[in-house]
Amino acid sequence: MKKHILYLLFFLSVMGLNTSCNYLDIVPDETATEADAFANPRAALKYLYSCYGYLPQSNMVQGCMDFTGDETISPFAETYVKFAEGSYDSSNTIISYWNTLFQGIRQCYLLKANISSVPNISKDEIDLYTAEADFLIAYFHLLLIKCYGPTVLVKELPALDTPAANMLGRRPYDECIDWVANLFDDAAQRLPATRSTADYGRATSVAAKSLKARMLLYAASPLFNGNPDYANFKNPDGEQLLSTTYSEEKYKRAADAAWEAIELADAAHYKLYESTSVSTSYPEPNDLTQRSLRMTFIDKEDYGEVIFAETRKAGTYSIQRKSIPYFPRGSWNGIAPTITMIDRFYTANGLPIDEDPEFNINNKLDIVTIPDGTTYAVPGRQTLYMHMNREPRFYAWVAFENGYYECRTTEERYAYSSFWGAKASDDKWIKIGRAHV
């Protein structure tokens, strides 16, 4: 009897497993499919926005290539600091465009392949979305070129079952530049020059031409134009990836592209930012040049200079929050320019600090008393000699010991000294000596 019971229990267990497997094999009805993404015009627009979602978030330190150099330093254990430390390697990827941008390129090609099948979508919408997809494909390739040099050119939607032997390889640098430039030109012909407030941040013809011009200038630079260091940079089949022959024509091409972008932007009423108002609450910056340089990055009311905007909300780890001096409500001063970058700012006479006879470069680290009448720092207090008598860009963009800083939510002017943060007061605001403004 016991033996029969055991057989019965075993049989029921097996049947239960089979039932469970069949149940788990069922795809839930609410699971989104590719067809759902193009079910109607609204869904197609959401899919287009998902293509934009692959853009690196340039206001976050984790996605900004500006932090791969030696221009900044941080006291925190930030991942991007590994570039400056020399501890970046293939097993510790940071800002890895290779892992994400090819996904974005495929997403764009899927949109191009399916957009015409969307019910009730207009021809104008089809043309616009396709142009935006081409713009993003070009821009994603541009970012790959900036990060890796010669890259894989994805010119069409690749099949998922492509055998390894047919996988695309890297193409020569000049071929990459030419293909991306042509794609930017093609997209620009079908994109609007400006965007309404509701569509702010989406691709425009001005953005396409501007990015093309910047890319061509980069390609004309000595880094990629006739650099002999790349003589042995070749594909496995021996194909040269970077030409070692200098071409002056590349500079002319870059200049022509830049002029074309400027004329297009001017016709669309883009303009350089200029601050026309001066604060009456503060002793500085009364200089309009200095105010324009500072406010061009923070004036939300006048953004006529912005060509291609980052519209995603800045979070806790945004560049802005980590750059400005310590505030109790969420700013941490975790990014600062290096001394090398500080030295690159000119003097008040418009000369490099090592070429101005009135600037004693040997005394740049001396502690000095700020004289009466100074408008960019607190008279009577102390700071370093190198902070004195510098150009407007320096005082617009760099906060330093006992220099002034404007706060939007208060009419107090605070100076900075010491190293570690404290409550809102006129001291102890900069953790690492100086900060980006």
Each model region followed by its residue ranges:
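A solvent-exposed, charged loop/short amphipathic helix patch at secondary-structure junctions
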Residues: 226-246, 415, 419-422
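TPR/TPR-like (Sel1-like) alpha-helical repeat modules
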Residues: 246-263
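Membrane-proximal, proline-rich intrinsically disordered regions
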Residues: 21-66, 234, 386-388
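TPR/Sel1-like alpha-solenoid repeat signature
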Residues: 134, 209-215
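Bacterial Sec-dependent N-terminal signal peptides
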Residues: 1-29
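Conserved, well-structured interaction surfaces
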Residues: 39-58, 77-148, 162-200, 205, ...
